[in-house]
Amino acid sequence: MSGAGNRSSAKADGGGRTPAPVGLVFDDRFLTHNTGLGLVGDVAIYPFADPIAHPSSPELVGRAKHLMDLHGITDRMTRIPAYEAADDALLAYHTPEHLARVHALDRTGGDAGEGSPMGVGGERVARLAVGAVMAAVDAVMDGHAGSAYALVRPPGHHAMAGRGMGFCVFNNIVVAARHAQRVHHAEKVLIVDWDVHHGNGTQDAFYADPSVLFISLHEDDLYPVGWGAAEQAGAGVGEGFTVNIPLPSGTGAAGYRAAFERLVLPIARRFSPDLVMVSAGQDANAFDPLGRMALTTGSYREMTRMLRSVADDTCAGRMVLAQEGGYAPTYAPYCSAAIAETLVGPETLAEPIPEPYGPRADSTPSARSVGLDCARALAAATAVQKRYWAI
């Protein structure tokens, strides 16, 4: 499988043009997404459990935006206004019944599916999150920005067609990818999901679709259970266009780098997309309460650079990143800011984003070398994908 040839208009001209602006989509209304309170553990097991802030509190993206402001990153980005996704856009994936449920919950608050809390007035915020990623696509496909980062809440990659799931109400990146195809005529879209949890909703949407290549790097057997095995590679004409790379707990920079070099980059380049999209969750960081991986800000910089190189080589640099997970209250915002800093170029900043834990953060064994369990996982994923790709 090598993928169809690209439209000539989608490729970089190599003429040394001035880099296009980097876009940012952020709206203060995201901070009104009301996830309510959570519990430390299950009350059946921990009768002393106390309510705490929900892990997906929108305060985290607010902190990330504040950090980006303090370091002058947002000054070097073009602001892109978000808009609320309309029914016709949402119905490209979601069912009318799900839209009706979310609309009803707008008056009462509640759960939009399985663990997808929203408060009173939450429908507009959820539609705004989808529209923010769509607006990023608009800006990149129309040439107003070369790349764009949608810093949104609520996240989206777990949402299924008929229900929310895993803190996600609507599937932001799925709807935006369909928007890129329907409105901007992007024939082939690459979606890379590096969130620690598998993007089950995104896989579901495109499992039988050869026009969207979905690549997921995630912690093996975490959430949701039953999704993301290496053998899940697509169905029908879409077989070979789903690439699952489940990685063992504790995988760090070296393992992710190897996954990119052996699988992500060669397959992405052979697919040769018209648009690169990223479900840019940061919960694979070493300090996240909902994952057990070992990435640092440096890891997110490196993955961003590698995918930008794919976009530069295949589709004139067009890349859209959408915020997904990331729950470490103090560390996740640094990861978000590191991604944005990489897009604008750290050399343009008077004060680049520091690694909060200094050089020692990238000196652990998992940062320096690929462990045996990780090597086995990569070998298994590679064996599956060799059926479809010359890698």
Label each region the model flagged.
Residues 82-107:
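Charged, often glycine-rich, active-site loop that binds/positions anionic groups
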Residues 53, 57, 79, 88-91, ...:
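Short secondary-structure transition/capping motifs
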Residues 2-89:
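N-terminal low-complexity, Ser/Thr- and acidic-residue-enriched intrinsically disordered segments
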Residues 2-25, 30-31, 100-391:
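A general "terminal functional-core" signal
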